[in-house]
Amino acid sequence: MPNIETRAATAMTLITSADELTPWEVAWRQLAEARGNPFVTPDWYRSWLEHYDEDAEPFVIISCDSTGTCDGVLPLVRTGGSALRFAGADIGDQFHPACHESHELESTRRACAVLREHADEWSTAVFHGTEIDSDWLSGLRDGGSPLRVVTGLATAMPYVRTCVNSNGTPTGQSVAGSFERTCARARISCRRTTMSHFDDLKIAPSW
């Protein structure tokens, strides 16, 4: 994995303009590719923002470590004036912060400080296509910004891990093969249980 772009900045940054995203996109893309998830890349984010909901506003929280290195991105948008959600969650499969899996909890806890600081700019956060037992959701619940689960609606969806070649770009054959294997596992899983692995979560501030 190439070196992630660094910036001498504060630990957390809130992006509310599409133009402000550009300096962070290299680091953001590297983090998303390391997780193998195209739905949390800046490319997916911009495409959805430009073509699916032109009224949505960026609400992207950038997390940096003590050296100023970007180590996490929470790629949210604000819709309807006050609701936060992942960009394209209504048409994508799985969503989570773009960060190393082992950093999800800490990165999200730091993002809570931003949510609390800007509490007057949003009223509800709706997270579709997320794993209900993931570390990052735990971070939202206990990260210093009091959030509570309002509803949980189960919807099972397949998840395809994007394979990349040596230069970091996804390969068509690997994606197709990954999808085929994912579908096979999904069929086996559906026969064994009726429980969903993914849930739609609606989270709201409780202050």
What are these regions (language model features)?
Residues M1-W207:
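N-acyltransferase acceptor-side catalytic subdomain
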